[in-house]
Amino acid sequence: MVTLSSPSVIAGGRDIDSTGYAWWSGNARLINLSGKLLGAHVAHAGLIVFWAGAMTLFEVAHFVPEKPMYEQGIILLSHLATLGWGVGPGGEVVDTFPYFVVGVLHLISSAVLGLGGIYHALRGPESLEEYSTFFSQDWKDKNQMTNIIGYHLILLGLGAFLLVFKAMFFGGVYDTWAPGGGDVRIISNPTLNPAVIFGYLLKSPFGGDGWIVSVDNLEDVIGGHIWIGLICISGGIWHILTKPFGWVRRAFIWNGEAYLSYSLGALSLMGFIASTMVWYNNTVYPSEFFGPTAAEASQSQAFTFLVRDQRLGANIGSAQGPTGLGKYLMRSPTGEIIFGGETMRFWDFRGPWLEPLRGPNGLDLDKLTNDIQPWQARRAAEYMTHAPLGSLNSVGGVATEINSVNFVSPRAWLATSHFVLAFFFLVGHLWHAGRARAAAAGFEKGIDRATEPVLAMRDLD
């Protein structure tokens, strides 16, 4: 009987003799079989889209409208809400039907991708070159490889413009900075000034500078997507119409494993950026859906106690804390009035519930005394008890014995998962880059297949 481990398997692309890899080596067997490799990737895309659709429907089925999303372990509906679907003023979910539609559309498209993957894995041509030179994937064909880069860049650019169109023409997106506590709005005047957009890339990543993570308005976000969309599409056209220059041909390694390493390196970089963005940024990741940032929870606790004690008669402008510094208010290193106590370390935090209470010199004592709105006090109290922290001691003054059962902030979960995955992708990038460079230099022979353990194992049946 023929089995996956049987030496009698003679199907091309599936045995050691024809590929140099055992069955458990996965897609490595398909390096030189572009049709089969396409099938594997299309099927993989189908699995990803299936998870997105199924998990969206799972979250819809379990969603409780009376509770905030971040208290329900939700990580997908929060993204859809950020895009302006199903939410109203203050981030309140008013309709879950759009989420249901998105989930079903993903399930349907996953079925199409799954069928495409099965077709190309089992029935389609083993090598796409047999069908058309347009789909050629000869790893050493430098011009074709840059053509493929061009197609991908154009698709990425169109993806960036999808967000632009949604924000500008198709209902808008959720803006946590909208007056009164956030709302969905049309972004009618995106920032196109290159000095502003590319200025983010020149900023320091440290402290209050924050590189691109410091973006705090949707005009800059959408304007940035316009720029990146134009750059990606222009770059795609450039790569399709031109051939790589001599220095490019000499500088890069041109084989399948090298391209894998380049891709893993890019994904790793994007993962690290996404991790820091979701942890620190409350504009692109609104706290109404993802929960407060660590700095936000800390500042909201100081604000909550200020509101409480002021109602009890405390003079918040002059009360001293146990260290002799201001108990409720103090000065920042640059002279602004900031919250006192341990949260002083987060003095440069900005949030939509706090900014209306600032003046030209930081927090405005008159506004704190007379202008605090009920929604600001409620939101701060909610954020104070849902810090994205897992510490048993206080962090920034926040008592992190969190006032919820089994609460894990989606912000903490997403930041951690993206950081861990980015790290492993970086390791994969280094591993495959090293192998590709060694192979190109001629001294990497790989594992000796004659002594491969699987060859000494019994057949699976």
Swiss-Prot record:
Tell me which UniProt keywords the record has, alphabetically: Chlorophyll, Chromophore, Manganese, Membrane, Metal-binding, Photosynthesis, Photosystem II, Thylakoid, Transmembrane, Transmembrane helix
One short Pfam family name for this protein?
Answer: PSII
State the source organism's domain of life.
Answer: Bacteria
Q: Where in the cell is it found?
A: Cellular thylakoid membrane
Q: Where are the transmembrane segments?
A: 57-81, 122-143, 166-188, 243-263, 279-300, 435-459
Keyword Thylakoid set for record: yes
Note on cofactor: Binds multiple chlorophylls and provides some of the ligands for the Ca-4Mn-5O cluster of the oxygen-evolving complex. It may also provide a ligand for a Cl- that is required for oxygen evolution. PSII binds additional chlorophylls, carotenoids and specific lipids.
GO cellular component term of the entry, any: photosystem II
Binding residues for [CaMn4O5] cluster, per the UniProt record?
A: E355
Q: How does it sit in the membrane?
A: Multi-pass membrane protein
List the InterPro entries.
Answer: PS_antenna-like, PS_II_antenna-like_sf, PSII_PsbC, PSII_PsbC_sf
**MF-aspect GO terms:** chlorophyll binding; electron transporter, transferring electrons within the cyclic electron transport pathway of photosynthesis activity; metal ion binding
GO terms in the biological process aspect are:
photosynthetic electron transport in photosystem II
How would you summarize the oligomeric state and partners of this protein?
A: PSII is composed of 1 copy each of membrane proteins PsbA, PsbB, PsbC, PsbD, PsbE, PsbF, PsbH, PsbI, PsbJ, PsbK, PsbL, PsbM, PsbT, PsbX, PsbY, PsbZ, Psb30/Ycf12, peripheral proteins PsbO, CyanoQ (PsbQ), PsbU, PsbV and a large number of cofactors. It forms dimeric complexes.
To which protein family does this belong?
Belongs to the PsbB/PsbC family. PsbC subfamily.
Q: What does this protein do?
A: One of the components of the core complex of photosystem II (PSII). It binds chlorophyll and helps catalyze the primary light-induced photochemical processes of PSII. PSII is a light-driven water:plastoquinone oxidoreductase, using light energy to abstract electrons from H(2)O, generating O(2) and a proton gradient subsequently used for ATP formation.
HAMAP family in the record: PSII_PsbC_CP43 (MF_01496)
Protein name from the UniProt record: Photosystem II CP43 reaction center protein
Q: Which organism is it from?
A: Synechococcus elongatus (strain ATCC 33912 / PCC 7942 / FACHB-805) (Anacystis nidulans R2)
Provide the taxonomic classification: Bacteria, Bacillati, Cyanobacteriota, Cyanophyceae, Synechococcales
Q: Which gene encodes it?
A: psbC
